[in-house]
């Protein structure tokens, strides 16, 4: 079964998309065409959206699902005339909160994502810059400023995990690739020994690692199953020998990996 889902907002659309994606993920038997439409902030834009929604309904043979965070009632009323099934996120959640808190909401567009109102903005930018500057062991002299240092074999998911934690949580995460030479020495590289309390290991199934490496360097020793199996086995032995917590990234999303790391290390997110 196929359905179209629209994430519509008169702001960035981040809230509508984030919540909508989470809800749609619960319906694994349905294939969704997902369309984000931010800054629908005029009646003219709203009427154009109605046409898009109706076209999708005709094409799919079923009503599109609409997740909206629209503040303007006029725009919401126009969209309500479409052939879509509307889920008004603000009305669904703010009304019960207003009742519980005995206070009226400001109904401000993009409140949580506004630079001028968001003290987390610079924390996020600094964390992303830190992750990029300290990626793949490129430099180690700033490890004293790191909240976390991810270690593991090449191409096991360290970089995307560091960047996600920076963007989502403001965590300053560095990463360091463990090489065959490191494993043969049977100990941590000297650059990491001083920061052992910040280390967390990532590992991966050898067949998955071989597939990823083959996309980068096909038919190379680096990408061979035998090499991948050796590196994964030895790095896991190193983690156990050094008492470094680690998880296998094969079957987890970057969101799940990041959350598990923060819980196991007891690191508090900087973005509140």
Curated annotation (Swiss-Prot):
Catalytic activity: [pyruvate, water dikinase] + ADP = [pyruvate, water dikinase]-phosphate + AMP + H(+); [pyruvate, water dikinase]-phosphate + phosphate + H(+) = [pyruvate, water dikinase] + diphosphate
GO molecular function: ADP binding; ATP binding; phosphotransferase activity, phosphate group as acceptor; protein serine/threonine kinase activity
Extent of the signal sequence: none
Disulfide bonds: none
Record-annotated membrane-spanning stretches: none
Domain of life: Bacteria
EC number assigned by the record: 2.7.11.33, 2.7.4.28
The entry's keywords: Kinase, Nucleotide-binding, Serine/threonine-protein kinase, Transferase
Record-listed ADP binding positions: 152-159
Stored PANTHER family: PYRUVATE, PHOSPHATE DIKINASE REGULATORY PROTEIN 1, CHLOROPLASTIC
Task of the protein: Bifunctional serine/threonine kinase and phosphorylase involved in the regulation of the phosphoenolpyruvate synthase (PEPS) by catalyzing its phosphorylation/dephosphorylation.
Family: Belongs to the pyruvate, phosphate/water dikinase regulatory protein family. PSRP subfamily.
Name the UniProt record assigns to this protein: Putative phosphoenolpyruvate synthase regulatory protein
Organism lineage string: Bacteria, Pseudomonadati, Pseudomonadota, Gammaproteobacteria, Pseudomonadales
């Amino acid at each position: 079964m196929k359905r179209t889902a629209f994430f519509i907002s008169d702001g960035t659309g981040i809230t509508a998309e984030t919540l909508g994606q989470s809800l749609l993920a619960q319906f694994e038997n349905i294939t969704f065409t997902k369309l984000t439409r931010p800054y629908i902030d005029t009646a003219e834009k709203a009427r154009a959206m109605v046409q898009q929604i109706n076209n999708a309904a005709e094409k799919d043979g079923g009503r599109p699902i609409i997740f909206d965070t629209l503040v303007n009632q006029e725009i919401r009323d126009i969209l309500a005339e479409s052939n879509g099934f509307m889920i008004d996120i603000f009305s669904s959640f703010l009304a019960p909160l207003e009742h519980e808190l005995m206070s009226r909401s400001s109904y401000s567009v993009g409140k949580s994502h506004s630079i001028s109102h968001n003290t987390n903005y610079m924390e996020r930018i600094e964390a992303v810059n830190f992750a990029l500057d300290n990626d793949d062991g490129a430099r180690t002299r700033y490890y004293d400023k790191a909240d976390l240092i991810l270690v593991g074999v090449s191409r096991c998911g360290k970089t995307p995990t560091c960047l996600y934690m920076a963007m989502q949580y403001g965590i300053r995460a560095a990463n360091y690739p463990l090489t065959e030479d490191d494993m043969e020495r049977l100990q941590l590289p000297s650059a990491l020994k001083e920061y052992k309390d910040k280390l967390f290991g990532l590992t991966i199934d050898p067949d998955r690692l071989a597939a990823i490496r083959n996309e980068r360097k096909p038919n190379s020793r680096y990408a061979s199953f035998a090499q991948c199996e050796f590196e994964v086995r030895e790095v896991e032995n190193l983690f156990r020998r050094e008492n470094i917590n680690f998880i296998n990234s094969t079957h987890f999303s970057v969101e799940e990996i990041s959350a598990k790391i923060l819980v196991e290390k007891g690191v508090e997110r900087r973005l509140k």
